[in-house]
UniProtKB/Swiss-Prot annotation:
Lineage, opening ranks: Bacteria, Bacillati, Cyanobacteriota, Cyanophyceae, Synechococcales
Transmembrane segments: none
PANTHER family per UniProt: ACYLPHOSPHATASE
Keyword Mitochondrion attached: no
UniProt family annotation: Belongs to the acylphosphatase family.
Protein's gene: acyP
GO MF terms held by the record: acylphosphatase activity
Pfam families: Acylphosphatase
Acylphosphatase-like domain ranges (all copies): 6-92
Name of the molecule in the record: Acylphosphatase
EC number(s) recorded for this UniProt protein: 3.6.1.7
Length: 94
């Protein structure tokens, strides 16, 4: 699993109510990235991307642009040890 990386991100801006989670899921499935995405009650979106370094980097670049109608103001990210997640999913808001 050493060829995998995991990045935990928090995205701030106009990222809720604009299809950000659904677009993130579609992009992750296309890129072959595992993990999850969810809305936070404070208005941010939280996500975990796990996969090859190139695929995770592609997801991070996509997050900077976001979905149509979104306005990304800032992204906080933290590297974490990969957990071997099996798929990508949209999780409930917390």
């Amino acid at each position: 699993m050493s060829d995998r990386v995991r990045v935990h991100v928090w995205i701030r801006g106009r990222v809720q109510g604009v299809g950000f989670r659904a677009h993130t899921e579609a992009m992750a499935l296309h890129a072959g990235v595992q993990g999850w995405v969810r809305n936070l009650r404070d208005g941010r979106v939280e996500a975990v991307f796990e996969g090859s370094p190139a695929a995770v980097e592609a997801m991070l670049r996509w997050c900077q642009q976001g979905s149509p109608g979104s306005v990304v103001e800032a992204i906080e990210q933290r590297s974490e040890p990969p957990e071997g997640l099996p798929t990508f999913e949209i999780r409930p808001t917390v």
